[in-house]
Amino acid sequence: MVANSTGRDASALKSRKRAADSESEPLLKQGQPFPKQPRIGSELDKTRWRLKDDDSRHTWHYLEDDDAAKEWPQSYAEKWYLNQSLDLPDLPSPDSPLAAATNGLDFFEKLQLPSGHWGCEYGGPMFLLPSVVITWYVTRTPISPSKATAIYNYISARAHPEDGGWGLHIEGESSVFGTLMNYVALRLVGVEADDPVLVKARGTLHKMGGALYAPHWAKFWMGVLGVMDWDVVNPVPPEIWLLPDWVPFAPWRWWIHIRMVFLPMGWLYSKRWSCEETDVIRSLRKEVFIEDYAKIKWTSHRNDIGVVDNYHPKSWLLNTANWLIVNIWNPYLRPNVLKEKAEAWSSKQVDMEDANTDYACLAPVNATMNTVMCYARDGPDNYGVQRHIERLEEFLWVKDEGMLVNGTNGVQCWDTAFLIQAVFEAGLHKDEKWKPMLMKSLQYLERQQIREDCVDQDVCYRQPRKGGWPFSNKDQGYGVSDCISEAMKAIILLQKVGGLPEVLEERRLFDAVDTLLLYQNSNGGMSSYEKRRGGEWLEMLNAAEVFGRIMIEYDYPECTTACVTALSLFNKYWPDYRTKEVKTLIRTAAEWIKSNQRPDGGWYGSWGICFTYAGMFALESMKHIGQTYATGENSRRGCDFLISKQRADGGWSESYKACETMEYVEHPSGSLVVQTAWALIGLMEADYPHVEPLKRGIQLIMDRQQPNGEWLQEAIEGVFNKSCMISYPNYKFTFTIKALGMFAKRFPEEKLVPSWALQGNGIEKS
């Protein structure tokens, strides 16, 4: 494929436009009835799915027309996402770790998308797809048969093999949240109640107490859908947004993901807006409860919650506040003028979020709620509603199992930056073969830098973002400390070390540094989206129940390390720019990382699983302040912790349970290549002196590599809010290539080969 300077696929643009137009569903029309439920097919032809990469805006299209399918051939990337054969020849059997890294890059390079980045599913949470389906339903948005079938296939494939329910995420045990939401989603896309998948799931839901034991977010969605009465939903008072900013629990102090959800949720709660009753909704009222719907006393079930769902029980403070709002404030004291003022302010905040992201929104959780709010407020003909429906498509992803919803609109900038760094660690940037790939990546990151602050930044409580990079793309528009750092490192390496043209001038790197310096908290640690604004006691107001550490920004060893390493690299080439501030941040941030180390030598990770992930980053930070295994106690204890977890086969294995329990837990499936790579990278960053443990880990990575250069998917890699896991499938390339390259650079005399390449006393080339 040929990409032009904008990142759009020029060679296929015409045929893609025609194909996309022929497949897309009609937009909403004023006063239209509920669309007919789509016809669920038995199977879809995976060779007809196409991913449109509009400079990292991803949309999937199912091509019914044979000519359209021929005009828009399926790429290697699309085939890989769908688990189709790429028909690639086996590569020469690697005779060294560097050769294995080269083979891995040879495969991964073929997955680069036309605009220069790498895409992938970012799935895992099992409540996101149902939220989109409910949003489509209540806004009367037609669902094509191909979408409905793909959704049915995915949800069915992810049902628990024993009880048929669904959990909070794909590896979790069945919960009321997951089971109720996915049950409802299947019914809304046209699956009949007597379908075997739903019969089994309904039995599990009833055994857990039925829908009344769903957590807060599920009850909210059931209120929107009209399956439950709003009296069952614990309060989401929009009036809290009218509090003065100095109030210690004012919502501008909350973590961005919770306050962006609270805004549309509060508006809809205050309006008590529900979808018009339909036959499906009436049927659901009979199916998801074990009680007679007409006899349910909704207010008495506000606090009912399933055992599995109740990860973060409501505090006495929150329960007291909820009781006062429900029993005193709402019925007796709440003046209508204040209610309307709070709704108007929440509505304005939602509009600012939509404007600052061109309706892409922070993530699908608030995107779906914003869509419903705008529909309820403005009606279907409103431009904002139409644009919301259009942009929801960018959260959808198709894989071999079917259609899911990603946790954001992608991981484009994040994964691209890591791949670039891996190439440099392996020294592969010196090979002319990879220059076109690297140049496309550089141009992509250049285009995705955020060039301006938000409109009315102070009014909508947004952190300055000019010069930053997002997790996904600039449309989403949220700078994140580690995303800024990793992208900045990648660009400096490409332009200063790799000798590529300077497509991003130094003034724009200075903008990135200016923004990055704003993320440090008073204790030296670095947050994710914003500098911390409130105290940890605000977790007493955590109403989500299924998540932990959700109310405020925290300090993260991963984010802190990214900032330390990026600013260290920046200072090497621009030693005179804000020298004092840069060096002070590096020093104080590294001191925080030291203080965050646990007595056993590990660091707790908040964005990857878990101690292995954080340990890799923390040990890299220590290296940048001159501390290694030989020279520093923190590095030595960190290495000893990782070595103590190495398995007999040379690998590392950590379960998502470690994130929940905050204690190291091995994954039942055994060693995992991604966590093995993380551990090895951390050990090598710390100059761990004993080569044998490193060799054993490298051997496992080489043994798991396939003859065509790829690694196969294993356990889930990422996490957020302690309890919800999320997939990073590209990690099995970026970090394995990096680990292999680092080992080859440090130990060039070690000529390891994969076990599968050995025959007798020699090595057989495939």
Swiss-Prot record:
<dbReference type="GO" id="GO:0000250">
    <property type="term" value="F:lanosterol synthase activity"/>
</dbReference>
<comment type="pathway">
    <text>Terpene metabolism; lanosterol biosynthesis; lanosterol from farnesyl diphosphate: step 3/3.</text>
</comment>
<keyword id="KW-0551">Lipid droplet</keyword>
<keyword id="KW-0413">Isomerase</keyword>
<comment type="function">
    <text>Lanosterol synthase; part of the third module of ergosterol biosynthesis pathway that includes the late steps of the pathway. ERG7 catalyzes the cyclization of (S)-2,3 oxidosqualene to lanosterol, a reaction that forms the sterol core. The third module or late pathway involves the ergosterol synthesis itself through consecutive reactions that mainly occur in the endoplasmic reticulum (ER) membrane. Firstly, the squalene synthase ERG9 catalyzes the condensation of 2 farnesyl pyrophosphate moieties to form squalene, which is the precursor of all steroids.</text>
</comment>
<dbReference type="Pfam" id="PF13249">
    <property type="entry name" value="SQHop_cyclase_N"/>
</dbReference>
<keyword id="KW-0444">Lipid biosynthesis</keyword>
<dbReference type="Pfam" id="PF13243">
    <property type="entry name" value="SQHop_cyclase_C"/>
</dbReference>
<feature type="repeat" description="PFTB 3">
    <location>
        <begin position="635"/>
        <end position="676"/>
    </location>
</feature>
<keyword id="KW-0472">Membrane</keyword>
<comment type="similarity">
    <text>Belongs to the terpene cyclase/mutase family.</text>
</comment>
<feature type="repeat" description="PFTB 2">
    <location>
        <begin position="586"/>
        <end position="626"/>
    </location>
</feature>
<keyword id="KW-0677">Repeat</keyword>
<feature type="repeat" description="PFTB 1">
    <location>
        <begin position="148"/>
        <end position="190"/>
    </location>
</feature>
<dbReference type="GO" id="GO:0005811">
    <property type="term" value="C:lipid droplet"/>
</dbReference>
<protein>
    <recommendedName>
        <fullName>Lanosterol synthase ERG7</fullName>
        <ecNumber>5.4.99.7</ecNumber>
    </recommendedName>
</protein>
<dbReference type="GO" id="GO:0005789">
    <property type="term" value="C:endoplasmic reticulum membrane"/>
</dbReference>
<dbReference type="InterPro" id="IPR032696">
    <property type="entry name" value="SQ_cyclase_C"/>
</dbReference>
<dbReference type="InterPro" id="IPR018333">
    <property type="entry name" value="Squalene_cyclase"/>
</dbReference>
<keyword id="KW-1207">Sterol metabolism</keyword>
<keyword id="KW-0752">Steroid biosynthesis</keyword>
<feature type="active site" description="Proton donor">
    <location>
        <position position="482"/>
    </location>
</feature>
<keyword id="KW-0756">Sterol biosynthesis</keyword>
<dbReference type="InterPro" id="IPR032697">
    <property type="entry name" value="SQ_cyclase_N"/>
</dbReference>
<feature type="region of interest" description="Disordered">
    <location>
        <begin position="1"/>
        <end position="47"/>
    </location>
</feature>
<dbReference type="GO" id="GO:0006696">
    <property type="term" value="P:ergosterol biosynthetic process"/>
</dbReference>
<dbReference type="GO" id="GO:0016104">
    <property type="term" value="P:triterpenoid biosynthetic process"/>
</dbReference>
<dbReference type="InterPro" id="IPR008930">
    <property type="entry name" value="Terpenoid_cyclase/PrenylTrfase"/>
</dbReference>
<keyword id="KW-0443">Lipid metabolism</keyword>
<keyword id="KW-0256">Endoplasmic reticulum</keyword>
<keyword id="KW-0753">Steroid metabolism</keyword>
<comment type="pathway">
    <text>Steroid metabolism; ergosterol biosynthesis.</text>
</comment>
